[in-house]
């Protein structure tokens, strides 16, 4: 039941930690010799790799991902393969060109930060946007990646903090407006990346911070609480 909670708290945080070091590197790198293997197989290869694989599933759709995997394994049984072989089958299954996705997620380093930009109209949202920041490392990075994620709205009910709803959206570029939230009652806690589909550091608005100070322990969803 709590497998993804443990993955986030242990494995994924390992990835975040090493991805913010000067030694960070892309997930997909050329392995020319054993020294390169020893250097590059770390929290990025394993934990970030698994996290980004989860984002790939969200990007292409679970059914398409499974269909692509079946064709990939059937076509390449007992053979050596390259990354492009898998991507070809996933593209065929989902009908999308994944070139740009592969380049930004697998061939560049660093972790983006996502933060909410909220404007209120009384007790309702006038607008809600997600601002994406480039990775601080490697120095000079300009990567703004596509993210398919959920934005969760949580309210205090009595002594509990409960999820009202969770909306799946696509984030791209520096600023993405979540039009579905305009006019809705403002949540006590707004959680970007609810359900933990993408790989990014998260920030919170002031109202959410105050709610977490008082009620985080009363949030019964362990994954949301860990995020």
Q: What do these predicted regions represent?
A:
Residues 33, 82, 173, 205, ...:
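Alpha-helix initiation/capping motif
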Residues 98-101, 111-193:
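Beta-strand-rich binding/interaction modules
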Residues 1-140:
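Hydrophobic alpha-helical and helix-loop surface patches within well-folded domains
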Residues 13, 43, 123-129, 141-143, ...:
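Long, ordered, helix-rich scaffold segments
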Residues 50, 150-152, 212-215:
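Short, surface-exposed linear patches
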Residues 75-81, 91-93, 161-174, 197-204:
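Short, exposed beta-strand "edge-strand" segments with a Pro/Gly-rich flavor and a Y/T-containing core
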């Amino acid at each position: 039941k709590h497998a993804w909670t443990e993955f986030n708290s242990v494995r994924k945080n390992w990835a975040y930690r090493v991805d913010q070091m000067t030694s960070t590197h892309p997930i997909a790198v050329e392995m020319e010799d054993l020294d390169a293997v020893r250097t590059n197989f770390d929290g990025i290869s394993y934990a970030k790799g698994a996290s980004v694989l989860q984002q790939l599933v969200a990007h292409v759709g679970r059914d398409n991902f499974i269909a692509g995997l079946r064709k990939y394994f059937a076509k390449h049984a007992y053979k050596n393969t390259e990354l492009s072989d898998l991507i070809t089958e996933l593209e065929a299954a989902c009908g999308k060109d994944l070139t740009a996705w592969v380049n930004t997620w697998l061939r560049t380093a660093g972790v983006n930060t996502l933060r909410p930009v909220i404007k209120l109209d009384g007790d309702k949202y006038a607008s809600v946007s997600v601002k994406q920041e480039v990775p601080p490392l490697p120095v000079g990075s300009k990567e703004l990646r596509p993210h398919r994620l959920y934005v969760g709205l949580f309210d205090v009910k009595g002594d509990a903090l409960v999820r009202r709803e969770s909306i799946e959206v696509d984030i791209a570029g520096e600023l993405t407006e979540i039009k579905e939230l305009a006019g809705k009652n403002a949540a006590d806690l707004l959680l970007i990346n609810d359900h933990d589909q993408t790989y990014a550091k998260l920030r919170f608005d002031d109202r959410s911070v105050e709610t977490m100070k008082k009620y985080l322990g009363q949030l019964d969803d362990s994954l949301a609480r860990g995020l």
